[in-house]
């Protein structure tokens, strides 16, 4: 005998008038004398199961009475359409099998503090809003990979353990690697995915990345996921066009397939419907002027001298002036990574762009045209104080058939936070890793 249910909540409309078995967990229960209403969730949705005392055995009614929040059970009954019911359908209960009891479930309908909920993250993911956020996360990841695959990209997996820093920073998690010294958890797969680009033309990597940054902002995690495409024979303008098509396709897919989850989150869908190409573009110079002209509108967005990078308040201020994501391009080379191609007409700035999401969500993509001249790349490695011997393999990519190429990295959690309207990034990943959190 199979333990699998004969239907799911997501497919219940196909079974009106039929006898089915559902399997799931009790989300909520209401007793009204001889009637017991069980709101059952099965991972695909929720449905109201109506237990009428006169229609079931004494044992079944007693089981219904004994069910508590998050008890697991199998419920058999007849499917009935009812506009008044949550989701438009109900199950008239005939039999209930208690599979796993739940005693004093800690997350109750009352308000709980964030620390309590994070300590119980393994249970919190069952709640309606967390379920909706993580459903949308899964959709974003699927949409991103499927779109790239359809565009002819090849997934190219890159190592998580590396011998060097990709971006020349000290914010690395280190571990001992046998007799070879230190290894580091990858900050990005970009350098390695460039090798794949030389083989396949259009590639991407997808996986976890790690930053040992002592930051406690609502935008930062120490472990997060990135998808990083790289394209041969592509310049800075090609790169921005690819990004706006990519992001727009992801948002459209979520609107098409996860609209009900967005409603659970009370997301203003009209704002997402505006996310269509082309995205506005401003230069770093223009952004500096914009910040100076609108100082005081966003707390902490004080005027910046030319040459300084933006903080979160500056990104919020810039993005507030646009109704969709905005590119800020041509940053000073000094505040960007060593591998970014200088503008040939103005070498002090790089052919790069950050894509800022509206509504205060900040940078969701960082990208650039890469340096393809081996001599210039070697100069930049030295100028950043990096050990040349650590990057010989990376220089080889320029020594043997170099081509202009571009790419970008998109942080999954920041995109999910923006699309779902989630204020803090910790809710956009199943088990967030932060400065003061590594449990559960």
Curated annotation (Swiss-Prot):
It is found in: Cytoplasm. It comes from the Bacteria. PROSITE patterns: AA_TRNA_LIGASE_II (PS50862). GO terms for cellular component: cytoplasm. Keywords: Aminoacyl-tRNA synthetase, ATP-binding, Cytoplasm, Ligase, Nucleotide-binding, Protein biosynthesis. This is Asparagine--tRNA ligase. One of its GO terms (molecular function) is ATP binding. Homodimer. GO terms for biological process: asparaginyl-tRNA aminoacylation. It holds the Pfam family tRNA_anti-codon. InterPro entries: Aa-tRNA-synt_II, aa-tRNA-synth_II, aa-tRNA-synth_II/BPL/LPL, Asn-tRNA-ligase, Asp/Asn-tRNA-synth_IIb, NA-bd_OB-fold, NA-bd_OB_tRNA. Its EC number is 6.1.1.22. CDD domains: AsxRS_core. The keyword Aminoacyl-tRNA synthetase applies.
């Amino acid at each position: 005998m199979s333990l699998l249910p004969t239907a799911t909540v997501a497919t219940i409309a196909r079974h009106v008038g039929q006898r089915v078995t559902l399997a799931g967990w009790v989300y909520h229960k209401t007793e009204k004398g001889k009637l017991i209403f069980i709101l059952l969730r099965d991972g695909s949705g929720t449905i109201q199961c109506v237990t009428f005392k006169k229609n079931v055995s004494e044992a079944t009614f007693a089981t219904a009475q004994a069910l508590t929040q998050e008890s697991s059970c199998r419920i058999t009954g007849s499917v009935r359409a009812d506009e008044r019911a949550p989701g438009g359908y109900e199950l008239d209960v005939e039999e209930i099998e208690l599979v796993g009891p739940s005693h004093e479930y800690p997350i109750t309908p009352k308000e709980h503090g964030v620390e309590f909920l994070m300590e119980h993250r393994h249970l919190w993911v069952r709640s309606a809003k967390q379920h909706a956020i993580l459903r949308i996360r899964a959709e974003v990841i699927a949409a991103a990979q499927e779109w790239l695959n359809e565009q002819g990209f090849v997934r190219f997996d890159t190592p998580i353990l590396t011998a060097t820093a990709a971006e020349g920073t000290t914010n690395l998690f280190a571990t001992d690697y046998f007799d070879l010294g230190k290894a580091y958890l990858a900050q990005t797969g970009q350098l390695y995915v460039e090798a794949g680009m030389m083989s396949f033309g259009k590639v991407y990597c997808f996986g976890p990345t790690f930053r040992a940054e002592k930051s406690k902002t609502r935008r930062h995690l120490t472990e997060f996921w990135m998808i990083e495409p790289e394209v041969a024979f592509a310049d800075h303008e090609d790169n921005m066009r690819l990004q706006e098509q990519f992001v727009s396709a992801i948002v459209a897919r979520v609107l098409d397939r996860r609209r009900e989850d967005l409603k659970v989150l009370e997301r203003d869908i009209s704002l997402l419907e505006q996310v269509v190409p082309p995205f506005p573009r401003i230069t770093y110079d223009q952004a500096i002027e914009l910040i100076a002209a609108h100082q005081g509108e966003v707390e902490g967005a004080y005027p910046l001298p030319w040459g300084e990078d933006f903080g979160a308040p500056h990104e919020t201020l810039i993005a507030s002036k646009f109704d969709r994501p905005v590119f800020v391009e041509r940053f000073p080379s000094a505040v960007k990574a060593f591998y970014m191609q200088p503008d040939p007409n103005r070498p002090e700035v790089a052919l790069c762009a950050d894509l800022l999401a509206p509504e205060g969500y900040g940078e969701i993509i960082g990208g650039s045209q890469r340096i393809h001249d081996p001599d210039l790349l070697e100069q930049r490695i030295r100028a950043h104080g990096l050990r040349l011997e650590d990057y010989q393999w990376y220089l080889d990519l320029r020594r043997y058939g170099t081509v202009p190429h571009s790419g970008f990295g998109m942080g999954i959690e920041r995109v999910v936070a923006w699309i779902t309207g989630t204020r803090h990034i910790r809710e956009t990943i199943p088990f967030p890793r932060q400065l003061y959190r590594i449990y559960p």
